[in-house]
Amino acid sequence: KVVVRIAEWAPGSKSPVGELVERLGMAGNNDTEMHSILAEYELPYRFEPEIEEAAQAIDARVTAKEIAQRRDFRGVTTFTVDPADAKDFDDALSVRKIKDGVWEVGVHIADVTHYVRPHSVIDDEAVERGTSVYLVDRTVPMLPERLSNELCSLRPHETSLCFSAVFTLNENLDILEEWFGRTVIHSDRLSLIHISEPT
């Protein structure tokens, strides 16, 4: 299978003139068929070298100054829930009891804005892609793997920077208070299989 581009189609001609863009591989091969699906729907399955280089150049350090500017949830029970084979953990939940009948629930999303500046090459590419695409056997990420699987992945027992929505609830699940802002967390990992097992 190949990807071709129509280069010219003369008026009155039954057939266009095309040019070879890329060889995908032998029909029937799993990688070939997956790449064929992505090509058919114009979904990019690799990043340009300049984007990968920009991702590698990002400073991974989380400084004490940065942590001091955030609400600290590192001592609160926090966990991700994803498939067992997941590599990108981009959201987590936290739960703690405030007092009898009152609970705090936090929804934590990886704070990509800490690492990706507006209108940078990575930001522009993410805007172009719009979302990560999940196929049966692979993920086509919105961000380079350096970000999606490392810097912006809420990996277990690591300091992670997040943007969070935090709600205080009563036993009837009425929202008593709400807060939105930047946080820092330590999360544990649960899998979908783990939480589905009977106790």
Feature locations, PLM:
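Short, solvent-exposed aromatic-acidic interface loops
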Residues: 180-189
